[in-house]
């Protein structure tokens, strides 16, 4: 079972709002809204599903919007201001950061396809609105872009559970990079687009 699906099934029903990325964005103070709410001014906005159990940035994209969002977004999607900067994925245990990794992208690749992830010492604190939820789960994971919170997960980052310092994703429709000194771990039966990861 995909790790996010297991987290959804196992969580306290009162905490299901954590899976709602629009609620997280709104609570974080971001400029955002669901399909049907017009954008405040013309420009590029980030669009993605409100809930995405599959992960991997499925259907996430930048869209230029003049005003109305009805024609450009599908039901179940939301828009948000665009953030720039470092993409950090941080695991917390009882509010303390226990795993901190930074993603590297290539500008010519799709938004959701990272070139690699590496451990780092950089991190951000958990948002205050999360309250006592971290006390009820073994690990909480948060993702930030440029210091702005974009997602919360009621589980840890599975890609760094192998004693590794770095991860290189392998995508099914792209050439296998076969990096020297890394070992391959298959994603078979887990992710649709990703074939697996190289770890070191």
Walk through the language-model features, giving the residues of each:
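Active-site nucleotide/adenylate-binding loops and adjacent lid/helix of ATP-dependent enzymes
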Residues: 2-129
